Amino acid sequence: VYWSSHSTGTHAGAAVEKDHAGSVSVAFGRPSAPENSSLSGGANGRSTTAGQKQTAWSDHFADGDTADLSFLIVGSTRTDNGSGVDQDLLTDWTTQVNQAILVAEARKDCMVIASPRRSSVVNVSNESTQSTNVLADFNTATSTSFGVFDSTWVYQYDRFNDKYCWIPANGHTAGIMARSDLQRDAWVSPAGFSRGQYLGITKIAFNPKQASRDDLYRARINPVTTFPGQGTILF
């Protein structure tokens, strides 16, 4: 669109440099061959440290007047070890879960939803060992009426990265709690075959048998179990 009289010094094909009233202007050249460049010198981002996550719970969610929420969902507790390498330590898991519980107990208007560590259940072949690991994890968590603990990680499709991955089950657990609240009432249990079904997952890392489910239940941990023909259920 022609809307003004521009200097011909900037026309395509003009001399590379042209003097206009004592100044030098650089002309626009015609397109040339594609430019090939290689990005270098960058670095991958790091995971947050346990201390950073602990501080974030207090800084962003402690004030009930400014942070309106019902669930504090403790996601993956993997942290940076200070040199850019991820780690999955029980001490870091305990720090993060207990800090979230402190926030919830102080607010008294929300609940913490937590899953065990990834290394406790994922790629652990023995069901009995998985049960022992989960019990050991939650044995370090503060006993509270403001927390809900489940027993596993789930394997599902990540449509944003076009791949399958393991994630903590607590996001799904919070979802079925919200659904139960919406369809029934807040005090109605979201567990069982009618209200406790996990959707959109391929498999779970730890599928506890009856003996393990009994042990988990006594330790205030809600077993997540897959039943043939029934799906995956918060039991």
What residues fall within each predicted segment?
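A glycine- and small-residue-enriched flexible loop/hinge signal that marks low-structured segments
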Residues: 1-235
